[in-house]
Each structure stands twice: as C-alpha cells, then as structure tokens.
C-alpha cells in the first residue's frame, strides 16, 4: 500500500502476507474504534433508484439496472462511512502535520494546528457530531509517537517533527480518513489564494461549480451544495481570522505576517493536489474534440510525471488503472465528461465556459507549466 501511495506499481497480495504482521503484536497497537452510521434499507433504496417493480428471479439473472444500482449503493455506503467517521488521534496528528507546506513542525506549532482542526470540526454544521476519540492535544501527539508512526528530533530543548518519505506515506493514509471534514473550508481558502480579493458571489459560484466532483471524490454528504452552506462555512473562516472581509461583499486571504496565515495555508494545501489533478485532466480534454480514455490517461500521466519532478509528490491516479477508471467514472457521473457511442470522451460545454473561473484556483507558474507541456 505504501509503495502504491508513493507512486509505485500495484503489487499482488499473497496469502502469506498475513503472517508478516505477527511481529507487530509485540508492539503497542493503540485502539480500534467501531462506529455505526445510519442503516440503508435496501427495499427503499431500490424503489427510489430503480422502480417499484425491481426484481431478480435467480442468481444468474443480471438485469440492466443492476450495475448502475450497485454503483450507487456503493457510493451510498462509502458516504455513510465518511459521515460517521471516528476522528482518531493519528488522523488529527497527520492532517495537522502533512498540510504544513514544509511538512515540518515544532511541537508548539503542532499543538496549535491540531487545536485549529478540532475547532473546525466542532463548529461544522455537517460534521459537528462526528466522534472525536481524543481531545487532549498532548495526548494525541504522544499516542502517535507511541504507535511508532513518527519520532521527533530534539533541536535544543524543542521537539521537531519531520517525517521521512515512508512516514509521510503512512500518515497520509490517516490524513485521508478525515480530509473530507475540511474540504469545503479548503476550497474556499484556495479560491482566494492567488487573487488579491474576490467578490463573495463569485466564490459561491465557483464552489457550486467545482463541488460535485469533490463530492464524488471525497464521498461528501451531498452531491451538490447550497449557497447558504457556502456562506456559513465562509463566515466560520472569517470569525476564526482565516479570511478577511473588511471590504463589503469581498473576501481576501490574510496577510503573510498575520498570526492565522499558516492555518490558512494549511487549509488551502488540503485540496490543492486534487484541484491540480482535476485541471490537468480538464486541460487535456479542452484541447481535444474527442479522446479515448487510454489516450487521455497517457497524456495526463506524462504531464504529471513532469510535474512530480518539480513538486516532489506523485499523482498515482494517473499510473493506477483502477484509480483512473474511477476518476473518469466520477467525471461522467457529474457531467463534466460526455461519452460517445465509440467510447471517446469530450468535455461538456459548461466546463469550457467556466475555464477562466477554474484558473482562479492556480498560480500563473502552474498554469504556464500546464499550457507549455500540453503544446
């Protein structure tokens, strides 16, 4: 798993893999948390998504609706799991550390950052009731160390946390478990990162447009988002000093010397890799009238490999066939892509019209790089 997360090739599993973990039982294993989400009534689900007369008369029968209904049910299960996630110590530690631009933090800075993420959960209208398994911040850090996920370095009398590449891959698994709790905040922060100030209504329009693909990607509660939900999230960020609304009906990022600037950047960093992946794909689509899925994957993979050399972080979605297939499926479901009878893909008209809005998420260097590599 760690190899795949770092961009390596997918490895086959073996029956003998289970025996390799026996040595871990002598170590501290922490806690396992079991949390139940809302039950899904299958009869109601099929009635609503197929029709009242759905039926399968034998195990060999595969009606036309079965594949799509199974996919929708899978999405519903994952959404339910995410909505009832247990926020563990390791997840909080991981998201606090890995959203730092340098992925290096002192203990004091880490304590402040974990507390910031805890308050965002508490104030969230969607996820305020999720189970946070531990709120003592020093205990959160101590437990992550005890589990062996990271060892601090002492610089003078201060603890500094600087994970190795293997530790980053491990911690990323735990970070990803709770990233969805903060993705709306992250998108709002990213929308004002490269522009001096932005009208509130433009931010709302941009988030409404991009939200469906993130809802699919992160299995969020709903596939679409309302203006009120965006405004509430925006207001939460303003109250915490993460955004500035000094000028009426305009939003801007805090100044670099502002106390809250590092928290603002941490939130922005959370959605940035997914946004870049989205733009890499969309840029390839905009430059093609129609393109096969294999050709699209090849173009994106080549471009991402060049980007990896600059950024130092992989884009495994373009090297893993299953991940890429899932991504294309999500883009079709959210109507960003159209597919013709030959299986070729094309960008929907609305995405072409919104290209300038999407570019608001990125700095000029990234946009120039994508444009030059694509030509």
Regions found by a protein language model. Give the residues of each.
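Membrane-interfacial terminal anchoring regions of lipid-handling membrane enzymes
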Residues: 1-375
């Amino acid at each position: 798993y760690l190899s795949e997360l770092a961009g390596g090739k997918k490895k086959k599993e073996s029956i003998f893999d289970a025996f390799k973990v026996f040595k871990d039982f002598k170590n501290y294993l922490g806690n396992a948390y079991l949390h139940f989400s809302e039950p899904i009534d299958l009869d109601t689900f099929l009635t609503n998504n197929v029709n009242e007369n759905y039926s399968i008369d034998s195990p060999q029968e595969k009606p036309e609706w079965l594949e799509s209904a199974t996919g929708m049910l899978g999405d519903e299960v994952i959404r339910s799991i995410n909505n009832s996630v247990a926020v563990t110590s390791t997840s909080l530690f991981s998201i606090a550390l890995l959203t730092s631009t340098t992925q290096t933090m002192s203990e004091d800075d880490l304590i402040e950052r974990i507390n910031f993420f805890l308050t965002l959960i508490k104030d969230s209208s969607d996820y305020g009731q999720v189970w946070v398994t531990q709120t003592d911040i020093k205990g959160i850090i101590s437990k992550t160390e005890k589990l062996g996920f990271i060892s601090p370095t002492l610089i003078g009398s201060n603890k500094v946390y600087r994970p190795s590449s293997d530790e980053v891959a491990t911690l990323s698994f735990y970070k990803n478990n709770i990233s969805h709790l903060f993705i709306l905040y992250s998108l709002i922060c990213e929308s004002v990162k490269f522009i001096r100030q932005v009208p509130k209504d433009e931010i709302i329009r941009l988030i409404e447009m991009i939200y469906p693909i993130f809802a699919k990607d992160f299995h969020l509660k709903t596939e679409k988002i309302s203006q009120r939900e965006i405004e509430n999230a925006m207001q939460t960020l303003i109250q915490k000093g993460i955004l500035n609304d000094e000028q009426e009906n305009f939003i801007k990022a805090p100044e670099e010397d502002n106390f809250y600037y590092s928290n603002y950047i941490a939130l922005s960093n959370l959605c940035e890799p997914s946004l870049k992946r989205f733009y890499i794909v969309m840029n390839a689509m905009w430059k093609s009238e129609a393109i096969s899925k294999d050709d699209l994957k090849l173009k994106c993979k080549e471009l991402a490999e060049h980007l990896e050399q600059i950024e130092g972080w992989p884009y495994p979605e373009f090297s893993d066939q299953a991940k890429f297939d899932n991504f294309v499926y999500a883009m079709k479901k959210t109507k960003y892509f159209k597919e013709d009878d030959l299986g070729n893909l094309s960008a929907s008209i609305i995405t072409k019209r919104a290209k300038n809005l999407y570019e608001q998420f990125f700095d000029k260097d990234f946009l120039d790089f994508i444009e030059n590599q694509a030509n």
